[in-house]
Every structure is written in C-alpha cells, then in structure tokens.
Curated annotation (Swiss-Prot):
Residues 1-90 are annotated as: Domain I, interacts with DnaA modulators. PROSITE patterns: DNAA. Belongs to the DnaA family. It comes from Pseudomonas entomophila (strain L48). The gene is dnaA. One of its GO terms (cellular component) is cytoplasm. This is Chromosomal replication initiator protein DnaA.
Length: 508
C-alpha cells in the first residue's frame, strides 16, 4: 500500500469535508508504508480516537476503491513517522464542551475498527464569553537594580519575575479578558471549549493549543482568558503573554547584553507561554531556531504553550517545517467570524457594560451590516453611542444611519447584487447568465437560491427588487429561495459550508 495512494485518498476526502474539519482532524495525520501496511500517525490520543470513530471508515472505502479493490492493512498510532517509535497514548481528559462541539461539527460517522481506551469526560464549567484583542506590551528588560515593578492599575495586570539577578520579565494580562466576558457562538464554540480545557487542566489538556483565524475574532481574548484563569487557580504561576515580535526583540536584546543563557533559562522556566501572531516568526531563522528549542523544552517539561496565528500553521510561508510539524502535536482550532446571532449578543453585552440602552432592533440593524470582525462591530457601536450622547438622542435606527452613514455606504458599495451573482457563479463554476436564466436543473437552481439568500442578507434591496435582478422573478420565488436555504443550512453540511465560505468572501 503506497503513501501516494493514501495522499490521493486524503485529497478526495478534502473535497468531501468542510475546511475546518479537514484541517483539524485529517491534515495533522502522518503516514508511512511498512511493507503492505500503512501506518497512520496522529499527534495525540484525542485526534486518533476522533479519526478512528468518524473518518476511518470513509478512508478505508476510498483506499479500497482506488487500490484495485484490495482491502488495505492500516494501523492507527500516536506519534510521528519521524520518531523511532510511536508515543504511548496519554490519558488526557476531554471536556464535555469540546466533545459536544466536535460531535456537532462532524456529519458522517464511520465504522470503528481500532479499539481505544475510554475517555474521562469532566463537566466543564458553563461560562459566557466575549471577543476583543488588546495590544501586547514590553516583556523582557535589562535590570539596573533588583526592585520589582508594582501592579498596574486599571484593565491590565503587570507581573514581574526576577531571573538570575540580571534580567526581569514583565507579563501583561488584560484582566477584563476572561471566559466570563467572552460571548460564545457557533463560530468560536470549539475554540472556547478547547481554551477552557487547557485553562482548567493545563497538565492534561492540549499542548500546544493553536488558535488561528482572521483579525478581531477573539484569539487574543481567549489566550488572556486562559492566562487569567491559570493565575486565579495559582497566583504564583509564571504565566507569560507576549507578541511574537516581542520574543524576537527580547532575543536580540539578550544577545546585545551577552545574556542569551539567562534568556533561555527564563523562557524555559515558565509554567505557561502564550505567544500571539506566530506568523511573524516567518523568515526569521535565528528566532525560529531559538523558539524551536524553547518549544521543545517546554513540552518536554510539561509546561503549557498556546499560540495564535492569522492562518493555518501549514500555510505560514517562511516557517520551518519542523516547527509546523510540532505545532500539530496538540490541537489546532479555527476561530471563525461571528454569525448574526453572536454579533447581536456581542453588541447587547457591550451596550450593557457601557450602561447604554440599545434596542434589540437597533443591535440587529448594526449586526446585519457590520460582519467582518468583532473589532469593527465594537467600533461601530462606540460611534453610535458617541453620536447619541452628543446629540442628546436615544439610539434608533435613524440615528444609527446618521452616525454610520460612511460605513454603510461603503458596505453597500462593496456588497451589491451584481457582486454576489459574480461571486456565486465563480464559486459554483457556472455562468452568471445561468443564474438569470429559467433553467431549473439542480446544478443551477441551488446556486441561484444561495445567491438570492445572500442578496437578502447582505443588501437593503426588497424581495421584488432582488427578484427583478434575477431575471425578472416574482418576490415569492425569492422568499421561497431564502426559506429553502435556511432549512438546508440546518440539515445539509455542504450547503452550510458553501454559504459560510461565500459570506466570508463577500464581507471580508
């Protein structure tokens, strides 16, 4: 059984699965041929069990179909093809929230063919959460004396750690970024559950935890939430949060001070290392070399590592393959843009924190039109609140239109029915004229319904106007299309993924 056949079947499976499922469960797998047997290595026990339960059956079907009908001999192991022997399966507890979320996101179950040990499932503490990202602060400075820095007042907590009498570390955690202030929705549910598992069981969770996604989606908030929870459980813990560029600057400073050994000892002595925007290590060879050894030392010592990036680790250009491989040893989770309901919840919670009365229809109006990320959503709300305060008026949809007129005009310009039709046609590889035609074949009718539903959600056009722009159709046809797509989004994983991808493309 060749490795090439496995890779061919994995590519076929990629086409069948939503991108997040493929990246989380299939992409981290490594494979090697041992005679007529294929050995498939998972980075940890949880990935192994999940692949075994949900995807192995389909993989075996594909291997049989494309391997001349021969049933393959296949073994699932924990470890890496580069290691001399597979690692023993750890007894890591899996949070109920994580398990429940995984089950929701996986649509097709496969036959279980490899026995696995039972998993202990503790009940995770129910928490409501919210999304925001602060800037990182200085972390590693030369010392002229042995005095420590007092805790800063306000939102940010400053902690100082003395190292070898020559260096100090000041780690800043935003105390408002907790699990309680994080608004949870479908888009971030898995990431939040995994972060909670790490925070509550740092010695038995996922290591490293790698969160990736666009800007302003809550990756940094979750990272701070973990750090704050660890310090709440153990105030003496050494929890270090910093931006990747700060790590580079610290290393350069240590080299200039001839203090590289102290630098190494410090970073390898922390209980938890939280590094934001790991993609900035790209093409910095010396920094990658130092971080590689720091990362290995921390994992070998059982210390927790949490990383974030704006993209999937394998897609970070200029990052060494050995680092990408190690990032896959733990759990890699995407943080998606928030869906409409979550955006409304974020706005209502922010307004409540600001002690401002925000009518639900006003929150819905803002959430419908500001879709790219939470940071822009909160910025829009601040403008509305300021406008309301200065004008001495209650917040209404009319006031929102006045205060956000430039943003709304830009949004209307970027998202037009013409643009939606063009994007949907390209996505489904059909012609725009097909969308406007009277053809009723499934290959055309379904994309047309998707385009109509997107037009209703993303533009201010009425149903009759949308119908007119789709070949002169009646408004009842548009209404039927919108209802049909909403139903399919609940029952059809492919339609749900298509709609989400198109929505992201049109609003980013």
């Amino acid at each position: 059984m060749s490795v090439e056949l496995w890779q061919q079947c994995v590519e076929l499976l990629r086409d069948e699965l939503p991108a997040q499922q493929f990246n989380t469960w299939i992409r981290p797998l490594q494979v090697e041929a041992e005679g007529d047997e294929l050995r498939v290595y998972a980075p940890n026990r949880f990935v192994l069990d999940w692949v075994n339960e949900k995807y192995l059956g389909r993989l075996l079907e594909l291997l049989g179909e494309h391997g001349n009908g021969l049933a393959p001999a296949l073994s699932l192991l924990i470890g890496s093809r580069r290691s001399s022997a597979p690692r023993a399966a750890p007894n890591a507890p899996v949070s109920a929230a994580v398990a429940a979320t995984m089950a929701q996101q996986t649509q097709q179950a496969a036959q279980v063919v490899v026995p696995s040990e039972p998993i202990v499932v503790p009940v995770a503490e129910p928490v409501l959460s919210e999304v925001e990202e602060p800037s990182s602060r200085d972390s590693f400075d030369s010392m002229s004396d042995s005095g420590s820095v007092p805790a800063a007042s306000g939102r940010t907590e400053q902690r100082t750690v003395q190292v070898e009498g020559a260096l100090k570390h000041t780690s800043y955690l935003n105390r408002t970024f907790t699990f309680e202030t994080f608004v949870e929705g479908k888009s971030n549910q898995l990431a939040r559950a995994a972060a909670w598992q790490v925070a509550d069981n740092p010695k038995h969770g996922y290591n490293p935890l790698f969160l990736y996604g666009g800007v302003g989606l809550g990756k940094t908030h979750l990272m701070h939430a973990v750090g704050n929870h660890l310090l709440k459980k153990n105030p003496n813990a050494k929890v270090v949060y910093l931006h990747s560029e700060r790590f580079v600057a610290d290393m350069v400073k240590a080299l200039q001070l001839n203090a590289i050994n102290e630098f190494k000892r410090f970073y390898r002595s922390v209980d938890a290392l939280l590094i934001d925007d790991i993609q900035f290590f790209a093409r910095k060879e010396r920094s990658q070399e130092e971080f590689f050894h720091t990362f290995n030392a921390l994992l070998e010592g059982g210390q927790q590592v949490i990383l974030t990036s704006d993209r999937y680790p394998k897609e970070i250009e200029g990052l060494e393959e050995r680092l990408k491989s190690r990032f896959g040893w733990g759990l890699t989770v995407a943080v998606e843009p928030p869906e409409l309901e979550t955006r409304v919840a974020i706005l209502m919670k922010k307004a409540d924190q600001a002690k401002v009365e925000l009518p639900h229809d006003a929150a819905f109006f803002i959430a419908q039109r500001i879709r790219s990320n939470v940071r822009e959503l909160e910025g829009a709300l601040k403008r509305v609140i300021a406008h309301s305060h200065f004008m001495g008026r209650d917040i209404t949809i009319e006031l929102i239109r006045e205060s956000l007129k430039d943003l709304l005009a830009l949004q209307d310009k970027l998202v037009s029915v013409d643009n939606i039709q063009r994007t949907v046609a390209e996505y489904y590889k059909i012609k725009i004229s097909d969308l406007l035609s009277k053809r009723r074949s499934r290959s055309v009718a379904r994309p047309r319904q998707v385009a109509m539903a997107l037009s209703k959600e993303l533009t201010n056009h009425s149903l009759p106007e949308i119908g007119d722009m789709f070949g002169g159709r009646d408004h009842t046809t548009v209404l039927h299309a919108c209802r049909k797509i909403n139903e399919l989004k609940e029952s059809d994983a492919d339609i749900r993924e298509d709609y989400k991808n198109l929505l992201r493309t049109l609003t980013t």
